[in-house]
């Protein structure tokens, strides 16, 4: 089981491949608007082809990660997961103290992977845009 806290392209593509290989992927989305790519053209019958392309073979659930109830739901999912994939900017998960504590406590052997497009070290990290 894969808990997918990713959005846009790099992370969803990574978890799409895991789903293509048979993993159960549970994508966590914001309850207010879902993944940003749900609104990206082109559309077929009202559905974003971009979103559908990189989010196939996934179950999707809307969870408010900023609420206590959302953190508890995430903790339950992580507790039953084999892998956690997220692609927040470096340090974002840690800023959500409740989520960071949840990911650290729930499953001690859970491999967590950041599928970021930019590196937290090197040229990208030292650019003037690295904190944006």
Language model regions located:
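N-terminal helix-loop segment corresponding to the beta1-alpha1 unit
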Residues: 1-131
């Amino acid at each position: 089981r894969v808990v997918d806290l990713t959005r846009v392209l790099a992370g969803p593509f990574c978890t799409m491949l895991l789903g293509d290989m048979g993993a159960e992927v549970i994508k966590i989305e914001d309850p207010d608007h879902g993944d940003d790519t749900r609104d990206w053209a082109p559309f077929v019958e009202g559905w974003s082809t971009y979103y559908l392309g990189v989010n196939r073979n996934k179950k999707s659930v809307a969870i408010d990660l900023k609420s206590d109830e959302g953190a508890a739901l995430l903790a339950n999912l992580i507790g039953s997961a084999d892998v956690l994939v997220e692609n927040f900017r470096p340090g974002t998960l840690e800023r959500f103290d409740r989520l960071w504590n949840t990911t650290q406590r729930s499953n001690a052997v859970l491999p967590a992977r950041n599928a970021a497009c930019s590196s937290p070290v090197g040229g990208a990290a030292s650019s003037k845009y690295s904190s944006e």
